[in-house]
Structure formats: C-alpha cells, structure tokens
Amino acid sequence: MSATFPGLVHDAEIRHDGSNSYRLMQLGCLESVANSSVAYSSSSPLTYPATGTEFASPYFPTNHQYTPLHHQSFHYEFQHSHPAVNPDAYSLNSLHHSQQYYQQLHHGEPADFINLHNARALKSSCLDEQRRELGCLDAYRRHDLSIMSHGSQYGMHPEQRLLPGAGLGLPPPGADDLQGSVDAQCGLVLNGQGGVIRRGGTCVVNPTDLFCSVPGRLSLLSSTSKYKVTIAEVKRRLSPPECLNASLLGGILRRAKSKNGGRCLREKLDRLGLNLPAGRRKAANVTLLTSLVEGEALHLARDFGYTCETEFPTKAVGEHLARQHTEPKEQNARKKMVLATKQICKEFQDLLSQDRSPLGSSRPTPILDLDIQRHLTHFSLITHGFGTPAICAALSTFQTILSEMLNYLEKHSANKSTGTPDTNQINSNSDKTLRKTEAPTKDGKIEKTE
C-alpha cells in the first residue's frame, strides 16, 4: 500500500490528533492524486471492505475553516518532500515515471480505489467551503454535490465510478441541469482542478433587477414616494455621456456620506459587473436634473404635461396673438403661416413620439435611424428621461395655441365678409357706451343708474 501511495502514512507513524497540519497533509496528497489525468479500467470492480481502520475519514469537521492559502504553501512543500506527488508531472522528463505510476494505479488493490473515492468526496467538501465563502451556498445543496462525487450510492451505474470525469472536476452525465442552475444564479463555473472561478470576474445578473429604492427629492413630506432604481439605470449613469463618479452616484441614490461609503459602493457594483474606478472625473456638467432618478424625472415630465394641458391659457394667448393682425390684407397670409407652422410642429411631434431611448427597466427596439436615434438617446441620458416628454408637452400646448389663432382668424374673416360685427368688438363697444355707476342707499342696497 505504501508503494502505491507513498504520501499516505500509516496511523502508527502519524498521531491522529485532529490538528490542521494532518488534515492539510491529507488534502495535499489526495487532491494531487485525484487531479492526475488517469484512465481506469472497467474490469476492476470497486469493493468496500467491512472495516477500514487503516484509512481515516478525509472529511473535515463541521467547525473546520478551510484556508486555501495555507493549503497552497503546505502543498508546495509536500510535493518536494514526497516522490509520488511529482510537481513536474506534465513534463517530458517524467514520462516514464508517469507510465509506471499509472500501471501501479491500474493494477492496484481494491482498497486503493477507496482513496480515490475519498479524494473526490474531500474535493466536494473543499468546494463546499469555497462556495460558502463566496456567498452562493443557497443556490445549491451539498446533497447535489454528493450526487456528482458519490457514484452508485445515488443511482449511478457501478462501472461509471471508474470514469475519470468524477475525480477530475468534470460533471458526470445528468449533472448539466445542476451546473446550469449554479451558473445562472451565482455566475460560477468549475475549472479543471475542481475549484470555483467567476465567469469573467462578475456575477450573471439581469439588468432589470432592482438595485435599490430611492426617496423622491421633489415630493412634499405628506406625499413622499420612493422610486425603484434598476441595475440598467445605474449602468447608464456610469456610462457616457455622464460617467458619474462615486460621490455623485451616491448623491443620486441618496446614500449617506460615510468614511468607506465610496469603497462599499464600488464593491457592490463590482459584484454586479459594473466598474467604478476610484478617482474618476465626471464627463458632463451637473444640473438639477442630474440629481433625479429616471422614475422621478418621468413623474416630473408627466405632471408638467398635465399642468400645461389643463392650466395654460391657450385660448386667450391664441386670440391675443391673432388680434394683432386683423387687416384684410394680412389675414390670408397669416392663415397660411399658421397652417405651415402647425404642419412643421406636427412633424416634430411625430419624430419625438418615435424616440426609443432606454428608460427604467425597458429597452425598446429602435424605430428611427441610428443616426438620429443616438442623438435623441444622448439628450435623454443627460436629462434622465425628462427632456423628450417635456418637449412633447410643450409642443402639444403650442399646437393648441396655433389652433386657437386659426379659429379666430377664420371667424374674423367670416364676419367681415357678411358685414356682421365681431362679438369681441360688440362687447368692447358696449363697455364704452354703457357706464354704470353704483350709489349706496339708506337701506344699504346698491342702486344701479345709467
């Protein structure tokens, strides 16, 4: 047994006192054996002896904290002190030694395969500890990892335990669904050595997921509302044309100033795949709209449009402008000018209505050409979504004013052709001719006299 696995020492030589050094020695040896790319024959059945006092359980205790740094340093020293674990196992000089080592494993005793089985289980335990440190343990259970490492105990065919995939960090048949769920929820993949790495250094996230909720800046205390900020919106604030720094982004998200506030924000963004370097300078000028999240900016634009539609004196303004040009020679030219202005304004409104700039959690498909859409998107990003709806509301109000001007000109020209005076002119003449005086009486009543 010692010839096959020189790194495993008998119990009589090493005292099993539960110390970390002994556990790490088992870890370094068993992991190196399990990671060796060896093909096993299906002709040698795997049997388990009734009693195995020669081999201690390779599992760590439940309260054991796995430290990869100590393991790496100890494993390096362990490789140079034991000839069976060759650090130059993939070089050409050790080819003959690797073939001899393969023959020893291939014709080994059935008990030798127990070590390989324990090594796989030990690697699963180490993988469990690493994923717990990354905070992604909720995405799967240890029972699922046991399915990947414990062959026939969970329904796998007995001969499949001899395949090299389960001991080399490769998922067995039927484990694709488990691996896909772990990748989707944690953004983690298994490398060739059974370790855990991040896919591209970031977690896989959905841009429409909620990043935080921000209280409104413009709302009164009696009607305070919160607006949801998505990951896509935070990415837009960090991207051109604004390229906000940590201080401005923290102000938008209404984060309290603290000593490590910028570092905590950068770490949270880094976990989501967003890069916010320290010492970054903003690229655009800061305005009052910069402090608004997109939800509040859209709310402000909607209230502005409603106020313009209901409260702006469009009829009075339109008639006042049309009354400045009541000469018969000017009326026809004035009508043509108003109609041309209405047509141009309508074309401008139609263009803005086709704007498909990304806002909130929506990213609609562009309708306009990219040459004009990118400019509209730039304006929308600078104003946080307030600009285009506000301009549309102003254009709608302007269209109403032009319509009132046109109605007044048509009515005035019709009255001129029939010879009937205008109603406004009648009212003005009546105000001049009729002068009413009010005199109080003894009874306290008001008496009207002409």
Curated annotation (Swiss-Prot):
Region of interest (H-S-H (helix-span-helix), dimerization), residue spans: 280-410
Give the gene symbol.
tfap2d
Q: Which domain of life is it from?
A: Eukaryota
Q: Does the keyword Transit peptide apply?
A: no
Q: Does the keyword Protein biosynthesis apply?
A: no
Major location category of this protein: nucleus
**Binding partners and assembly:** Binds DNA as a dimer. Can form homodimers or heterodimers with other AP-2 family members.
The region called Disordered is annotated at 414-450
* Name this protein carries in UniProt: Transcription factor AP-2-delta
One Pfam family matching this protein: TF_AP-2
Q: Where is the composition biased (Polar residues)?
A: 415-431
Keywords (alphabetical) are: Activator, DNA-binding, Nucleus, Transcription, Transcription regulation
Give the CC-aspect GO terms.
nucleus
Give residue spans, biased composition: Basic and acidic residues: 432-450
Q: Which family does the similarity line name?
A: Belongs to the AP-2 family.
- Which InterPro entries does the UniProt record give? TF_AP2, TF_AP2_C
Where does this polypeptide localize? Nucleus
